[in-house]
Amino acid sequence: MPDITAKLVKELRDKTGAGMMDCKKALVESDADMEKAVEWLRQKGISSAEKKSGRVAAEGAIGSYIHTGSRVGVLLELNCETDFVARGELFQGLLRDISMQIAACPNVEFVAVDDIPVEVSDKEKSIEMGRDDLSGKPDQIKEKIVAGRISKRLKELALIEQPFIRDTSITVEQLVKQVAGQIGENLRIRRFTRYTLGEGIETDQSDFAAEVASISSK
């Protein structure tokens, strides 16, 4: 019998969203071969991420999080399949964790890369193509470099691509799959809004000058 380590089981679980015991059994049946184990789970219909993704997740909850000092706030809609699950501890914990994640990620604007508008991608490409370090390079090489940079940049904008703040060895997407496997339902991050106190408000110059004058007089 092959040596099935906890690390190997965790890796398979992160990939598939299947339960811990199912992952261990899959690794035993496949002689600890990761790809064969994934295939085994799919054949048995246990690969949660694949099996549940086609089911409608129309229930759920809207969660909120206000960071210490009340300077950052988050509203998040997380969907599941049943109201029963939405009230459960695992679901509510995930809702809270993802809300905190959003609060900690000021650059994140979209749920997934697929949600990013083409205009944003085109703008990033235009910026990258004009960088000085690419001047003089052949077009084919330039395109390859730019494609890699854009891919990285778009992932920075997508919530599910971010390392989970409480366990940076997994992404938010993998976290959702793990909890979906534990709950036994399809889970989906639908949308979110992040608020920052004073965002978009320009400080009046006269007020700023008065502040400086006040400090100088002390």
Swiss-Prot record:
Localization terms from the record: Cytoplasm
Top-level taxonomic group: Bacteria
Main localization (coarse): cytoplasm
Gene3D superfamilies in the cross-refs: 1.10.286.20, DNA helicase RuvA subunit, C-terminal domain (1.10.8.10), Elongation factor Ts, dimerisation domain (3.30.479.20)
Pfam families assigned: EF-Ts_N, EF_TS
Xref: CDD domains: UBA_EF-Ts (cd14275)
UniProt-recorded Gene Ontology molecular function terms: translation elongation factor activity
Keyword Protein biosynthesis attached: yes
This protein's UniProt keywords: Cytoplasm, Elongation factor, Protein biosynthesis
A GO CC term assigned to this protein in UniProt: cytoplasm
Keyword Protein transport: no
Region span, Involved in Mg(2+) ion dislocation from EF-Tu: 82-85
Family: Belongs to the EF-Ts family.
Function recorded in the entry: Associates with the EF-Tu.GDP complex and induces the exchange of GDP to GTP. It remains bound to the aminoacyl-tRNA.EF-Tu.GTP complex up to the GTP hydrolysis stage on the ribosome.
Alphabetized HAMAP family for the sequence: EF_Ts
Protein name (Swiss-Prot/TrEMBL): Elongation factor Ts
Natural source organism: Prochlorococcus marinus (strain MIT 9211)
